[in-house]
Amino acid sequence: MKIKSIVAICAVLAMSLVSFKPSDKEVQSEKPFGGLALYTVRDAMKDARTTLEKVAQAGYVNVESAGYNNGKFYNLSPADFKALLDEMKLTPISAHQGTANFDNIDQQIADLKTAGFKYFVIPVPPMGLFTFDQVNKRMAMKGGAKNLAEILDKLGEKCAAAGLQLLYHNHDFEFRKDETGVVPIEYLLENCNPKYVNFQMDLYWVTKAGADPVDYFKRYPGRFKIWHVKDMDDQGRFAPVGNGKIDFKRILDNKKLSGMQYYFVEQDACFNETPLEAIVISHKGLEKIGFK
């Protein structure tokens, strides 16, 4: 082959490589977005550094803690936990604080602020009000919705004074009438002061209760600042986002009405994959649905 021919072929190949670039859609799909509730990977968080690295690699940018104990997040001081998140380019948004009460609320608020969180989330009725029937695997609450509302308002007022926002996270039992005929979630929405208390809607548990998230958005617009996005399989079990039957597109179309500022993938239990595999599947599902 002549030298000129070889040069010509090389030139064509070079031009082909230069002209090739991924489409805008492909670039966008690689851009990190969305949040993960670390409860999903709670066991793996024993090795916080490695696990958070994998969370970031899966494409998430925001995180929600569910591992506060004795003044530490996942056995790290609030400052050290914040430093680790910064290193991984992950942003702390919300923290589930299941042990909050009137005696420790000030310390917990201080720790959340040091770690960089914005939202203080009450995951279940606090201060001994939550009950769980081990035999029937059924969650419930005692003490009544009025009592819970008063507690949340007091805790929320403390949070607001410190620059945090308090949210209450639902399960399914709040959507069932109690022994007095009251639907607890509706009582809370109608009686808690929105200056101090708003809500984190868990889309799976609302669906599990037989309720419609969009109906609640319409009835109580602007009150649902964070969503938990988790799917439901045909057996009613938890599933990676996009692998179940919940119509997230319809719900997402009503994002503005709901007041949603952030959302987090959460999967309480995994059945066909490990939690670290599930969060990758869910992130791809988010993108297909239209979350960003």
Put a short name on every predicted segment:
Residues P22-G35, T40, M45-A58, L189-M201, ...:
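Histidine-acidic metal/acid-base catalytic patches
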Residues E64, S94, V121, L167, ...:
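Conserved beta-strand positions in the central sheet of alpha/beta enzyme cores
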Residues K2, A8, F20-Y119, P126, ...:
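N-terminal pre-domain/capping segments
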Residues D47-T50, N75-F81, D103-Q108, L152, ...:
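Alpha-helical scaffolding within the catalytic cores
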Residues T40-R42, G67-N69, G98-N101, P126-G128, ...:
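Active-site-proximal loop/turn and secondary-structure-junction residues that shape catalytic pockets
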Residues A11-S19:
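Hydrophobic h-region of N-terminal signal peptides that target proteins for export
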Residues L90, F117-K118, L164, L257-Q261:
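A short helix->loop->beta-strand "cap" motif at the edges of active sites that frequently abuts
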